[in-house]
Amino acid sequence: MVDREELIIEKCAGKKVLHIGCCATPACKEECEKGTLLHLNLLKSASELWGLDMCREDITFLQDQYQVENLVVGDAELIDQLFPPGAFDVIVAGELIEHLGNPGLFLVGARGLLAPEGTIIVSVPNGIAFRRGLKSLSGRETVHPDHNFYFSRKTLSQMLLSCGYEMVDIHGFRMKRSEFFGAWISDLFASMFSQWACEGIIATARPSS
């Protein structure tokens, strides 16, 4: 398993980056106070950083309280209407596509915004994490109220391939914000047996030639 944020920051170093869902709504203010908001940490790594989020209130908060520039309010599914083609070296979509009504529309639009040799980094909760399998044995299912989709390593890879990408790498990762016992059990099991039983999956892909 990998450290999600360390991997993203490393892959964005010295690059022109577009961060989708940059405000981490509704946890924006809390993460800023803790120093854990990914967008603020990416500012130290990327050569140029842009952010896109639908929450105007949190965008304004980052602009006013942290003097963050290059922030755009908009819909990720309309991304190709918001930025010019080939504008970015890296697009980061962390815990985003499971919230969308049409993740394929977003991924196809994002592909056109990548520069030659550009990459997209997508992270998602793992739909087949160990704890979810345990709950299913008792007839229960863990579903976040804002999630429209769940992904596994295979289905995330297949979606990226079907949207015109080729895989660079894919890993399991621990959810740092997951403090509840079930998530800890998933990550413990993953560390002992298989990383694909852990709480999250992160993939890097590039447009297929």
Task: Describe the residue ranges of each PLM region.
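A short, aliphatic-rich alpha-helical micro-motif
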Residues: K11-C12, L43, P85, L107
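A short beta-strand submotif of the Rossmann-like class I SAM-dependent methyltransferase core
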Residues: H19, V90-L96
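S-adenosyl-L-methionine-dependent methyltransferase catalytic module, highlighting the catalytic core
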Residues: E30, M54, Q65, G101-S209
